């Protein structure tokens, strides 16, 4: 029976991969030269035809601060002995794989931001949904900010400029108004056209509710306690995924080796190679 299930999985995965079209890797483009940064950045901040459909806005910084404090405190609660169990650990690793590997790395980053490959629309939306469950914002904002970062990496208009220090590039930038969000309507114009992506961008936080309800029910059914699975599957998992993702923006721009000039401070970091979901350009 186990062999049969494995065979069915392999056939299904094989059929999906046949529909994937890998694009020829684009040549590495260096960030905009320093003397042109301000001029080009200002152009991106000007209102575009997509601004009415997706009005640019700045972060509600206090909301971000309170959310981060709450999620980190809850992750500490999850580590209390009474919440440890194999089902809880399994929930963490499963949702880590679903959100960090499939959602952020494969979906938000490789597929939507860089268009490294092409998949059927339903599969693209599945990956985007997994990314939204990571609670790193919806696909429109994530992709727009990432494309902005690649255009102006480690310059004064880069929202997580590593030259401002490890803390700033790791998470400090989120607690200030992010001017780069004004450029999102232009940089994510291809995603704004899709109403499903606009939905994910607006309601990504709410996706945690059905997940929490399912985890609670499973925990109660297994007899390990519903809150154990909820705490490990949501707040603790979010904190783990957050910091591993952020280390790509901070640690790989501060420590490591640069075998060639990329035009910014990005480096190859061996530690991140084994801790991040997969090798990613930063």
Enumerate the language-model features and the residues they cover.
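Membrane-interface helix-loop junction between the first two transmembrane segments
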Residues: 85, 103-119
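Hydrophobic transmembrane alpha-helical segments that form the core helix bundle
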Residues: 60, 65-81, 85-103, 161-273
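Intramembrane catalytic core of multi-pass membrane enzymes that act on lipidic substrates
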Residues: 113-114, 126-188
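Transit-peptide-like, low-complexity N-terminal presequences
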Residues: 18-51
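Conserved small/polar residues in nucleotide/adenosyl-binding loops
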Residues: 274-281
């Amino acid at each position: 029976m186990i062999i049969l299930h494995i065979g069915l999985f392999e056939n299904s995965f094989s059929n999906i991969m046949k529909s994937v079209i890998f694009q020829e890797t684009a040549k590495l483009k260096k960030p905009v030269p320093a003397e042109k940064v301000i001029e080009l950045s200002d152009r991106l901040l000007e209102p575009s035809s997509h601004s009415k459909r997706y009005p640019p806005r700045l972060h509600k910084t206090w909301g971000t601060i309170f959310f981060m404090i709450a999620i980190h405190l809850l992750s500490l609660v999850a580590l209390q002995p009474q919440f440890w169990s194999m089902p809880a650990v399994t929930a963490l690793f499963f949702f880590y794989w679903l959100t960090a590997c499939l959602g952020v790395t494969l979906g938000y980053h490789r597929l939507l931001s860089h268009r490294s490959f092409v998949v059927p629309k339903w599969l693209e939306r599945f990956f985007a949904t997994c990314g939204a469950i990571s609670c790193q914002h919806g696909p429109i904002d994530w992709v727009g900010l990432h494309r902005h970062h690649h255009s102006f990496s480690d310059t004064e208009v880069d929202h997580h400029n590593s030259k401002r220090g490890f803390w700033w590039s790791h998470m400090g930038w989120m607690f200030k108004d992010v001017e780069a969000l004004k450029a999102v309507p232009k940089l994510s114009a291809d995603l704004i056209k899709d109403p499903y992506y606009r939905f994910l961008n607006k309601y990504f936080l709410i996706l945690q509710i059905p997940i929490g309800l399912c985890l609670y029910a499973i925990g109660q059914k297994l007899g390990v306690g519903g809150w154990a699975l909820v705490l490990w599957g949501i707040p603790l998992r979010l904190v783990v995924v957050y910091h591993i993702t952020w280390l790509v923006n901070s640690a790989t721009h501060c420590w490591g080796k640069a075998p060639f000039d990329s035009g910014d401070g990005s480096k190859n970091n061996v530690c991140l190679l084994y801790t991040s979901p997969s090798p990613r350009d930063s």
